[in-house]
UniProtKB/Swiss-Prot annotation:
The keyword Secreted does not apply. Residues 1-64 are annotated as: Disordered. Keywords: Coiled coil. InterPro entries: TMA7 (IPR015157). It comes from the Eukaryota. This is Translation machinery-associated protein 7 homolog. The lineage of its organism: Eukaryota, Metazoa, Ecdysozoa, Arthropoda, Hexapoda. Residues 21-50 form a coiled coil. Residues 32-44 have a biased composition (Basic and acidic residues). Belongs to the TMA7 family.
Length: 64
């Protein structure tokens, strides 16, 4: 390579891959993940609905 050759040899962005068809195992796995995500979101909403459990915060002693 001579000093005058500049730039990158590889393109900055890789070409997009074609979306391959999913087999049954992959489809079942993705469906299971979606169900788990929905259950997690429902649990989060249920947990935040009740309000904070502790109001204490950081306890400070009387000493300095």
């Amino acid at each position: 390579m001579s000093g005058r050759e500049g730039g990158k040899k590889k393109p900055l962005k890789a070409p997009k891959k074609e979306q391959s068809e999913m087999d049954e195992d992959t489809a079942a796995f993705k469906a299971k993940q979606k169900e788990q995500q929905k259950a997690l979101e429902a649990a989060k909403q249920k947990a935040t609905k009740g309000g904070p459990l502790l109001q204490g915060g950081i306890k400070k002693s009387g000493k300095k």
